[in-house]
């Protein structure tokens, strides 16, 4: 006897039908394949894991935690500039990303792209940017430009282009076309339709995406210093290398407060815009 499974009719009302034996077998095969993959992955992880360190991890964590308390508050004087650098990396990187992302989005959206070739190039830029993590961009740029906040800023910008452009071009494709048609009926040119028909509809999205990405970039820029790309992560890396745990705890607290404030600012600004 086949199992009962839900199905939807054309008018959206949920009905029920029996699952055939073939469908049941296919379902069981999928389950078995999934279980086999999980078991194989667990076996590979187990073979490459030193379980002594895993079992000893709680005591090691407790030991490190005890060394991190209390934080070295006097070290705060050396953190103000790295925090400011982190904010600058995120802010300037986001601005660079938005300057590139907006034209890429208009070139990629189906209703604004000049032709298929331009759209393909736009999609390639978006995918390339989204495929590479900001830490990898930072590593590459540190080798090219040397360590410092310039490498971190450009890394944040390159990583953010794809994220921002994707959200913006999807918003462009979902605009109300009646406004554009009304402007077109007046004999407006292509640029005029873009400026008066499309851009006003997507401006809130552009602003919202920019603020949202800035919030994300604050968090990402805190760790770029681990690869030499400036910011407070550079101080964190130095403290970790010297086992200065009281400094590490203070840096983590500063990062936590910075991220919390950036999220609060982002939420307030986006709430006012959207």
What are these regions (language model features)?
Residues 1-95, 102, 107, 111, ...:
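N-terminal, non-cleaved signal-anchor transmembrane helix
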Residues 23, 72, 86-94, 125, ...:
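Loop-to-transmembrane-helix entry motif
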Residues 80-88, 122-129, 211, 215, ...:
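Alpha-helical membrane-interface segments at transmembrane helix boundaries
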Residues 94-102, 106, 110, 135, ...:
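Hydrophobic positions within alpha-helical transmembrane segments of bacterial inner-membrane proteins
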Residues 104-138, 167-170:
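Cytoplasmic-entry segments and transmembrane alpha-helices of multi-pass inner-membrane transporters
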Residues 126-160:
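Generic hydrophobic transmembrane alpha-helix motif, especially the helices
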Residues 147-213, 264:
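Membrane-cytosol interface at the C-terminal ends of specific transmembrane alpha-helices
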Residues 249-274:
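C-terminal transmembrane helix and the adjacent membrane-cytosol boundary/short C-terminal tail
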């Amino acid at each position: 006897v086949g199992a009962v499974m839900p199905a939807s009719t054309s008018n959206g009302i949920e009905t029920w039908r029996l699952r055939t034996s073939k469908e049941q077998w296919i379902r069981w095969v999928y389950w078995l394949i999934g279980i086999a993959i999980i078991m194989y992955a667990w076996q590979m992880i187990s073979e490459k894991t030193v379980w002594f360190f895993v079992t000893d991890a709680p005591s090691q964590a407790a030991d490190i935690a005890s060394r991190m308390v209390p934080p070295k508050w006097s070290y705060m004087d050396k953190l103000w500039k790295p925090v400011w650098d982190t904010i600058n990396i995120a802010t300037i990187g986001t601005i660079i990303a938005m300057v590139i992302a907006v034209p890429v989005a208009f070139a990629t959206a189906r209703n604004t792209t000049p032709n298929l070739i331009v759209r393909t190039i736009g999609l390639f830029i978006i995918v390339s940017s989204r495929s590479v993590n900001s830490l990898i961009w930072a590593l590459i740029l540190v080798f090219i430009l040397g360590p410092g906040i310039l490498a971190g800023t450009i890394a944040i910008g390159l990583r953010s282009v794809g994220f921002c452009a994707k959200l913006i071009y999807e918003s462009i494709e979902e605009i109300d076309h009646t406004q554009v048609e009304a402007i077109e009926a007046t004999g407006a040119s292509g640029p005029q339709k873009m400026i008066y028909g499309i851009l006003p509809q997507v401006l809130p999205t552009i602003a919202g995406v920019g603020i949202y990405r800035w919030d994300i970039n604050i968090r990402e820029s805190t760790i770029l210093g681990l690869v030499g790309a400036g910011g407070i992560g550079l101080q964190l890396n130095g403290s970790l290398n010297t086992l200065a745990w009281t400094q590490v705890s203070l840096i983590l607290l500063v990062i936590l407060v910075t991220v919390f404030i950036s999220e609060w600012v982002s939420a307030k600004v986006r709430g006012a815009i959207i």
